[in-house]
Amino acid sequence: SAGVAYFYLKLTEVTGNAEFAEKARCGLSYAAAHWRDLLLPEQAAFQDNREGVPGVHLGAHMGVGGVGLVLIEGAKTFAESKDAEKYRRAAQAIGRFYTDESAQQGESGPYWTGSPALLMDGGIMLFLIALYETFGDQQLLEFIKAAGAQYLRWSAESPRGGVDFNGAGIETPFDWPNFAFGSAGSGYLLAHLFRITGDARYLEVARRCADFLDAVAVPQKRGKLIPHKLGGDDEFTVFYLGYCHGMAGTLRFPTLMGTLDNDIRWATMVNQLADGAEALGAPEHMSAGLWNTVCYCCGHAGMAHTFLGLYCIDGSPRWREFATRCGDILLGSMKTHADGSASWPFAWERVHPEELSQRIGFYDGAAGIASTLLELFMLERDDYHWPRMIDDPFPEDPRR
């Protein structure tokens, strides 16, 4: 319910519609009351098995931390409402779950799943940073610092160059280097750790994550792209373009670094990744890493959101046009029903493009797709304003 509630939050912010606000409150209230249901053995097993990632139910994208992030946004949006306190208390309860109940003790500090992936421990830390910055708690900041020290222990010098954080697991024969599981996401977290602590170690290791990404980047006809996977038969051959394992997520890392570190390499990296995506024919043409999927996680909704973010930075018509072209594809792939509702049939799994589903969630379905269409609507109306979560480094408003 959290992702759908977040969509209704956005509808409320844009339209001021009381019916949408009530739906958002209902979803948020349910999430506040039932977030622990994600920890029930049968529910945790279902979530982990569905995504094929053990421990994902604890993380920040498809687990408990994601519920906490949405509750924080609910407390902000409904700050003048009596419900805001309920959402705040629930978000802080999730914070205590991470600090007091589920944390394990490593050699240098606390951790949870043992995976540095943003989908796992990295995302949990992003949630805790957001919680600290929203409500303030010096004790929580000290906990984050200790967890950051443990996180640094998971870095590994790569023979390819730079530093690697392999969220796929140390025992696996392959490496996912992009945003949700790899060094791009780890570098992003480290940049935030530097931002809130001022500890230069985090900035230095983040730079070395970028060195690793540069070392494994594959030149295209124009620009470069980071492979979906390192190791295995399809190494260096599949390039996702979406948020999870591809360009739309990975370029968030250099975007954030560009706000903290005055080095031209960050803008260059952003442009190279965008060039690489267009060199593969995106957004209109499918490729090995852009199959018949349009969702926020893997497809056109996530790409449009990212390019709208880039447009907010410099106002380039190029970014706006790319996002609009993605929006055209979202509208063209929409299925309308007799009752006036709409859904999007697409293939969630790249390796099973024939298996279509009509999911409703934010990362994996209609809520995220419709949110992106809402952004494009505001862009056309010339009143674009999009408050950002912590995994979203772009300005809230376009540069004027």
Please state what every model-predicted region is:
Residues S1-R400:
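Glycan-recognition and catalytic cores of secretory/periplasmic carbohydrate-active enzymes
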